[in-house]
Amino acid sequence: MITLLKGRRKVDTIKVGILGYGLSGSVFHGPLLDVLDEYQISKIMTSRTEEVKRDFPDAEVVHELEEITNDPAIELVIVTTPSGLHYEHTMACIQAGKHVVMEKPMTATAEEGETLKRAADEKGVLLSVYHNRRWDNDFLTIKKLISEGSLEDINTYQVSYNRYRPEVQARWREKEGTATGTLYDLGSHIIDQTLHLFGMPKAVTANVMAQRENAETVDYFHLTLDYGKLQAILYGGSIVPANGPRYQIHGKDSSFIKYGIDGQEDALRAGRKPEDDSWGADVPEFYGKLTTIRGSDKKTETIPSVNGSYLTYYRKIAESIREGAALPVTAEEGINVIRIIEAAMESSKEKRTIMLEH
């Protein structure tokens, strides 16, 4: 249910600075912060002055990081700059005593993430990673089925994140560089979801490559996370004209098959904001199918999806800052995603399974 929207009540407003105003800042962060009473977007560091004036006329456009880190009124900084700059920008904000939300992927390496976590702990500031797809309608539905016992004793968990982008685009995410490519960009989402459900695996076996002509970085990945009896298979390609199921989950007596993808991103890209209770609703044709076997009885039923809610992440961040509540995504969880990515790249390069230390 949508609550705490602008104008509903007065709160102790958290003044926010945003670093970067590309896709992430303008679509995934700005619109959510804008509708919640808890936040006020004070400054945005970007060269896209006209876009900010159009979208957030009350926000000040700045061009230097210090104009945000040196502002004592700003409590929270959202880091949405290119992934290779996350470490540098986040460390500067931490040292300035700011709470920080980092766009995923957290960092290029787990070592960088651990250094940031230590710095945040020493400074007494909060550090979280924006793994928003924990609040996709399909994933929330899967969590509900597991918690209710409708999916038990899972042996196979398979999730895909495919796109049809046969031509390499002139975007930093698709250029050779630090923390670029689809494993960092899209894979981090489904890795985080998997770790959120099952924790860290025993081992990782992966194939990571560039499939498209003229590709400069990874555009295909296939990971198997070994949990013993449970095997989690995560994959994504960039030349996929027609998608199969996004999720295929099999347990001892039940299976859940789900097509389609949460529509919050498309809605935000189209300029919509989450201002009513229809936000995050799934398309009925994409509702998942739960098949259950009890003895000789086999039943398949359609499961209406739980509404998605990216707003939940920022509601919880406000509660963490103002009330000391637990973070919705911890720095350690962000680091664990990078540990899996590093293991996957090592596995692919060396053509072997990488055992993980716990």
Curated annotation (Swiss-Prot):
Any GO BP: antibiotic biosynthetic process
Assigned keywords, A-Z: NADP, Oxidoreductase
Top EC category: oxidoreductase
GO MF term set: NADP+ binding; NADPH binding; scyllo-inositol dehydrogenase (NADP+) activity
Induction (UniProt): Is constitutively expressed, even in the absence of both myo-inositol and scillo-inositol. Is up-regulated under certain stressful conditions.
Superkingdom per UniProt: Bacteria
Known catalytic reactions: scyllo-inositol + NADP(+) = scyllo-inosose + NADPH + H(+)
GO cellular component annotations of the record: cytosol
Observed effect of gene inactivation: Cells lacking this gene show normal growth on SI as well as on glucose or myo-inositol (MI) as the sole carbon source.
Pfam entry (one): GFO_IDH_MocA_C
Described purpose of this protein according to its UniProt entry: Catalyzes the reversible NADPH-dependent reduction of scyllo-inosose (SIS) to scyllo-inositol (SI). Cannot use NADH instead of NADPH. May be involved in reduction of not only SIS but also various oxidized compounds manifested upon stressful conditions.
Protein name: scyllo-inositol 2-dehydrogenase (NADP(+)) IolW
Source organism per UniProt: Bacillus subtilis (strain 168)
Gene transcribed to yield this protein: iolW
